[in-house]
Amino acid sequence: MKNNRILAGIAAGVIMVLTLVGCSGNRTGGAEPGTEPVEGSRVGVAMPTQQSERWIADGANVKASLEELGYVVDLQYANDDIPTQVQQIENMITSGARALVIASIDGTTLTDVLQQAKDQNIPVIAYDRLINGTENVDYYTTFDNYEVGVQQATSLLTGLGVLDENGEETGEEGPFNVELFAGSPDDNNANFFWDGAMDTLKPYMDSGVITVPSGQTSFEQAAILRWLPETAQERMENILTVIGDTELDGVLSPYDGLSIGIISALTSGGYSADALPVITGQDAEVGSVKSIIAGEQYSTIFKDTRALGDQAVTMVDSVLKGEEVEVNDTETYDNTVKVVPAYLLESDIVTVDNYEELLVDSGYYTEDDLK
């Protein structure tokens, strides 16, 4: 009898240990959202690169806001290397992250690693760039990227004098020689920027008000892989060679980094800094804002990344607390597997006439930042 009691006790102990081990194994990544306190929970934040000041600022903003709410943040930058980003996300999962905020390098390459996140009940927030080809992305926060493209084209038309400051046609018929640049083909946003811009410019291209001397009018021809300024500079140099003595009146650029490369090519190619074509941009990076003030780049698009970061943090906090996550778009962002519920923010056109109001008065930059 005594031996039976001992054996029963040992068996019960073994069962308890196995049960605890089993529970521990199921909880490696994250608990079911809303079932545990969030104080001290770990959140992984994966950003694409530190080569752009906007991504450095985005990462810092998200990290600081999450920490204010009591989260422990693992912030990683992948230097625009896809395997590095995948490895970083895997490490976040195995280190016990309860949520992931991901600004992808290539939105089509994360299917396998996000399945790992799903297996651990880890919610995923796509940050500014849509993650494609997987059901395992829960929410998306970004700006209205089609509208950003519209704004870029509108500012180009305004700079050319085709539209006035109110967006009304002036009757100016040109023809204006314009070259077109697009973003990285592996960034889903680049297509939205391009579509918004081209839908705005096409009527003027069809009527002859705008001509493209190089003839390069497709997204594939205009795209700049990884948004690299040096690639944009090289393409602009090649275009100048192709078009010869034809003088350019404008360049549609979807990003400030590309704009800087384009300006370098133009000045090297014989354009003076005070007689450059109308050049657009995006992100209101310091270098481009200074260029706008100096009369070189004409415009940029200001996307307040503080608001974007705040929205991502709000989504993380809501989903981990088991609360309803606020979205304002459930139709636009189809990643080929699902329509990802999204929250879209608004953006603004910045020129020399309003940069102080939009960028300095709002506290985004100080006057010293722009000197």
Protein language model regions, located:
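A residue-level marker of the well-folded mature domains of exported/periplasmic proteins
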Residues: 2-5, 23-371
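Sec-dependent N-terminal signal peptides
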Residues: 5-15
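C-terminal motif of bacterial Sec signal peptides marking the signal peptidase cleavage site
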Residues: 18-22
